[in-house]
Structures are given as C-alpha cells and as structure tokens.
C-alpha cells in the first residue's frame, strides 16, 4: 500500500535510487517529433535541444549541457545568470518544464529504440 501522506511522498522522491530517479527526467517532445516517432515524451539527454516552457526563462531555447539525475534538473546552453563576482553560472531547470525540440541521435541504442517505436 502506498501512503497518501505528502511528507511520505516527498521522502519517497528524495530517497529514490538513481536508476529509478532517471524516470523523472522525462520531457514532452514537440509535435513534429511526436508525429515522426509516435512518442509523446522521452528522457532528456545531454545534447538534446530544448525550449523552456515555464518560468522566467520561458521561450528560450538551447542545447542541454548537463543533466543532474540527483536533482532532476538540466543546465541549458545560453540560460545563465551572473554571480556577484561576475562569473556566469547555469540556471538549473526542472526537466518537466521543458519541451524537446530536437533529439540527439548520436547514440545508436537511442536511435534504434526510436525507430522501433515509429508508427
């Protein structure tokens, strides 16, 4: 039985093993990718091009530079802020708040999986 208590739900998210936490790094794909491959969402990877859909950076687009599996957030090229000393740092954005506009198909396994799901 799964608990309905919010505190236990949060604890479950915080204590998930990394191999299960990667399932939380899923984002919606654009309409042209969805029609091409017959998928609605896919796990975000380094190299994918994404568009931010929510928040102060909404509408901005860039390539994923880094994916943090522990926090479920992405660093996107071109979306930075300045520290007090002037050095730029990435703004980490949650994977659920972006939409994938271009897939990185350099990995043969990923390409094969997408071709298999094609309708």
Curated annotation (Swiss-Prot):
One of its GO terms (cellular component) is cytosolic large ribosomal subunit. InterPro entries: KOW, Rib_uL2_dom2, Ribosomal_uL24_euk/arc, Ribosomal_uL24_KOW, Translation_prot_SH3-like_sf. One of its GO terms (biological process) is cytoplasmic translation. One of its GO terms (molecular function) is rRNA binding. It comes from the Archaea. Coiled coil: none annotated. Keywords: Ribonucleoprotein, Ribosomal protein, RNA-binding, rRNA-binding. Pfam families: KOW, Ribosomal_L26. The keyword Membrane does not apply. SUPFAM superfamilies: Translation proteins SH3-like domain. HAMAP family: Ribosomal_uL24_A (MF_01326_A). NCBIfam families: rplX_A_E. Belongs to the universal ribosomal protein uL24 family. Part of the 50S ribosomal subunit. One of two assembly initiator proteins, it binds directly to the 5'-end of the 23S rRNA, where it nucleates assembly of the 50S subunit. Located at the polypeptide exit tunnel on the outside of the subunit. This is Large ribosomal subunit protein uL24. It comes from Saccharolobus solfataricus (strain ATCC 35092 / DSM 1617 / JCM 11322 / P2) (Sulfolobus solfataricus).
